[in-house]
Every structure is written in structure tokens, then in C-alpha cells.
Amino acid sequence: MRPVTSFLNRKKAPKNNGDKAEQAAEAFLRKQGLRFVERNFFCRIGEIDLIFLDQNTYVFVEVRFRANNTHGNAAESLGQSKLKKVRNSAALWLQKNNKVNNSSRFDAILFDEKIDSQHLTWLKAVF
């Protein structure tokens, strides 16, 4: 039987495609030289998938995955309502962490069909 500590300390395996896409996006952005800050910041307004630091700029990242284009591709899933929630959540995160005077931008990592680097699109300063 496995010790409880090893069970509690193991890295959480992704439960679904959303988690897998976020993990792949995080790994990709780390390889690009961005410093990881936080994952899945939740507040009453909404959620931010990933937060990174690119030099002195906080980068708020929305991650999207579409297995097929029946309901549009990943880029088309970024509606104005979602973007507004991300912007407002980011403003709250900056305020909560005393970073209001820091520069920030909003990026999107998109996966269409598969969650891998060949199907990844990085949109910088997308909104």
C-alpha cells in the first residue's frame, strides 16, 4: 500500500481536456521564457486560467480547446462576455495583489483538434 504522503504530494493528473490544455499551455509559455505566477484564479466575477510574468508585464491567459469545429474553432469561442469577465477578474487580481501600477496584457492560447504544439496558437495582446 502506498504511503499517504506520496499520495498527497503526487502531481495532479488532468481530469479533462480543459485541464490538459491548461497544462500544455503552461508548459509552452514557460518554454517561451515567461515566469509562472498562478493558475485558475477564481473570483465572484469569473476565472483566469493562467497568470504569467513576461519581464515586468503581467500576462493573463485564456486557454481554449475545441476538439472539432462543430460549434466553431477555439478562437471563435472567445466571446465578448468571456473577455469582459477575464478583464474584470484581472483588474481584481491586480488590486488584490497590489500590482495595479504594473503593466498587463491579455493573451490567448488556442488548441484546435488536438492538445499538442502543432495545434497550438498563441495570440498575444488579443484583447
Swiss-Prot record:
Gene3D superfamilies assigned to the protein according to its UniProt record, in alphabetical order? 3.40.1350.10
What are the recorded GO MF terms, alphabetically? nucleic acid binding
Domain of life, per UniProt, equals Bacteria
Pfam families, A to Z: UPF0102
User: Which protein family is it in?
Assistant: Belongs to the UPF0102 family.
Q: What is this protein called?
A: UPF0102 protein Mmwyl1_2395
